[in-house]
Amino acid sequence: MATPKVGINGFGRIGRIVFRNAIASGDVDVVAVNDPFIETHYAAYMLKYDSTHGRFQGTIETYDEGLIVNGKKIRFFAERDPAAIPWGSAGAAYIVESTGVFTTTEKASAHLKGGAKKVIISAPSADAPMFVMGVNNKEYKTDINVLSNASCTTNCLAPLAKVINDNFGLVEGLMTTVHSYTATQKTVDAPSAKDWRGGRTAAQNIIPSSTGAAKAVGKVIPSLNGKLTGMSMRVPTANVSVVDLTCRTEKAVTYEDIKKTIKAASEEGELKGILGYTEDDIVSTDLIGDAHSSIFDAKAGIALNEHFIKLVSWYDNEWGYSRRVVDLIAYISKVDGQ
């Protein structure tokens, strides 16, 4: 089967890391990029050097129409209006919408006017169907043209919640994600009228914040709808975050049982390569560049009793999430081709 041809709209953090993951996996073929705010020489520089993930392992050059990466030409467009991007001329059928701006079905659908066939939003969406690989990707149908890969935190929490719910019954749960700072935060205290705390210096503070990631699990696992909610603590680290899920189970269970069950789920079936498992004494930087959605930390969790437990699972919120964007495109293109 032909490798799906991909276009990326928005060459920010996720756009560039999706690009790197596309090359690392070989499962999709990026043929075009659109970003009105980045000219090609600067795009080449930003792709080549990365403060978190290091230098790009390959060759990057520019030519009159875009970039040449590992000897392959990639068209570069600079359109502000998604409807004006000539994706079809570059052969791009699957578009990664990673600007963070066009996150509704209506807005993201504009890409279809330029010759694209499907749009994958690399963020939660108010109305587009959300898919989490290993959890509900089999619900995808070929008539869906705009879909969301949910958020990095939902991709970490959902596989964990699925294993607990499938095996022990999840009555209810509260999640806290201890989350690295992101591009929306500030380097020094600055105006942030909609989120006063969010305007404070990212590298100096632990900042409580809201997140819809836990509630979104109810959209990808309908039986958990209304059973999970959560919050975020933004902390002064550049990358890698960790989910803390405190939950009640229907069945009586020991923490050892939970460890065995999660370990088994990580080694075979739908969650292999998506859910990880470790008993090592790791810290956050040990997981930079880890491609799992969720890495269960067996030593970090605790149980109060047979029904009340705290589970801890790590995720590289840039790399792991971006790999799932690539996986989702590879998966839906396979379904589309059948």
From Swiss-Prot:
EC number: 1.2.1.12
Catalytic activity entry: D-glyceraldehyde 3-phosphate + phosphate + NAD(+) = (2R)-3-phospho-glyceroyl phosphate + NADH + H(+)
Localization in the cell: Cytoplasm
Enzyme class: oxidoreductase
Gene: gpdA
Binding-site positions, D-glyceraldehyde 3-phosphate: S151, C152, T153, T182, T211, G212, R234
Membership in a protein family: Belongs to the glyceraldehyde-3-phosphate dehydrogenase family.
Protein name in the entry: Glyceraldehyde-3-phosphate dehydrogenase
One CC-aspect GO term: cytosol
Residues the UniProt record annotates as site (Activates thiol group during catalysis): H179
Keyword terms, alphabetized: Cytoplasm, Glycolysis, NAD, Oxidoreductase
Organism: Aspergillus oryzae (strain ATCC 42149 / RIB 40) (Yellow koji mold)
InterPro entries: GlycerAld/Erythrose_P_DH, GlycerAld_3-P_DH_AS, GlycerAld_3-P_DH_cat, GlycerAld_3-P_DH_NAD(P)-bd, Glyceraldehyde-3-P_DH_1, NAD(P)-bd_dom_sf
Pathway(s) per entry: Carbohydrate degradation; glycolysis; pyruvate from D-glyceraldehyde 3-phosphate: step 1/5
GO molecular function terms attached to this record: glyceraldehyde-3-phosphate dehydrogenase (NAD+) (phosphorylating) activity; NAD binding; NADP binding
Lineage: Eukaryota, Fungi, Dikarya, Ascomycota, Pezizomycotina
